[in-house]
């Protein structure tokens, strides 16, 4: 059993004893702590909290415990049922709610679940708020409602349609152009909530044909749910046979978008954001944001339009903060996460699909031809295992000093930008390891510079 408590929420494997896995007692504790924080900090008078969940097998149990606890804390619950993460985020603002809880473990395997916590803007709690939830939970500073102040329970299953309408209403989504292109599309939704909402979206966008793979929302994932090439053999094989223009693949909560070209080759999840940003910047030039571990291609595309690129620390809440601070027109993360503030400040695969198809319709290229128009970069990912007594911060400080003549960013670990490549070192908050990301114009060069910096770290750790 595993239970991980962090500033972004609580996640774990279902079962086990209290404090050792994600079970009803721990769910009650952290839901109560979240409700206590919202009661103290919200400026909203609605008294509502929205709850949505992905299709995980444990979702029904977790939902019942969460909803009952929120009612016991005196909040009215708006349960929107099976819903994507971006749908739940939008529902918070559409309802005028005080906050929201998303029940999803994202791309983690079926035995996992999690509580992801939203503020009244439908955005994830910041680090300070997340830390306060952990403190309240540890101290058990809960004050449950008396009989006259228990919350009410409402079910509202209309938010998929409301989300789709919001996407269709975006100025840069051109339904007529998509319809005229007569696209044939395949989708893999890993038997979660994407299987409910994506076919509806594609139909409303005017896509001519949709081939559905693993679209039953049973929570019985047919492959590892992270949308990486090694997990997508079935849909890549389908695409390689021909007959489809593009395939879209989402994770269980539909905030990450991967794509497959018409020839069965991966588009590259780093390039989901790059491509959508290219389209947005062409029509509405402005600043862009991604995290430090994302491809340099977004910077290159942004500069092509004479605009400014900014990097944030890793994590959606940090990307959103930088988007707001720089008034960016688009941002996101290199894992296929597209954040389009014109819609809302959260990763949203539906927005990504609609903008990508609009771009593809206007360009008149095949998907592989479109991919070839972007700068070719390759990212290598490694890790350095250290002993628990190792002072990781001291090592990172020494690395920063060694490479002070290069462009160095230390807002999240240490990132060293060389003229034609970069390396990013990030320490784990839970283990004595350093994650190493490196990018260059070839995979060999990315591996080489990554290994070089790893050797430096090993020498400093002796």
Where are these regions (language model features)?
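Phosphate-binding and adjacent anionic-ligand microenvironments
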Residues: 246, 284-462
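N-terminal small/polar loop signature for handling phosphorylated ligands or for N-terminal nucleophile
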Residues: 36, 48-112, 200-260
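Proline/glycine-rich low-complexity loops and linkers
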Residues: 71, 134-165, 169, 261-334, ...
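An N-terminal, well-structured beta->alpha segment
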Residues: 1-68, 72-73, 152-184
